[in-house]
Amino acid sequence: MSELPELTPDLESGEEGFLIKPEFKPKAIRSFVIRAGRITVGQKNAFDTWWPVFGLGLFKGMINPEQVFGRKAPLVLEIGFGMGDSLLEMARNEPDKNFIGIEVHPPGVGRLINVAGQENLTNLRVYMADAMDVLEDCIPDGAIDRLQLY
């Protein structure tokens, strides 16, 4: 999958935790507003353990969904999954489909991959990046069967 995102100890707040940033290409206009990127020790552990399994990297280039998931199945792409509740529920209830989520909020990504790993969901992957960059550089034309935008 992808390399672990850069985690920096949060030394400014005085609280135990880490700072993490989504991937994005340099540009003036973004499709999102970066919310606080502070994650807890538990979320950092989720990234350490599960990002190599579920994480997809923006700068890895165009993906082949069949290779990413190890099978051919309809692909659902969800942009802006927040804390991941609905995406997790769909991945659980539709094991015949592959799901890719895109989110820039690190705590939500950490929670999603932690639960997905604990439940051994094999039909779920995630980008922590700008959706416009992912759509332009990573997802092949015609690969998406269903797009969900929040």
Predicted regions and their residues:
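S-adenosyl-L-methionine
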Residues: 2-77, 85-92
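SAM cofactor-binding core of SAM-dependent methyltransferases
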Residues: 65, 71-136
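A short acidic, Gly/Pro-enriched loop at the edge of an enzyme's catalytic core
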Residues: 136-146
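Redox-cofactor binding/interface segments in oxidoreductases and associated redox assembly factors
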Residues: 149
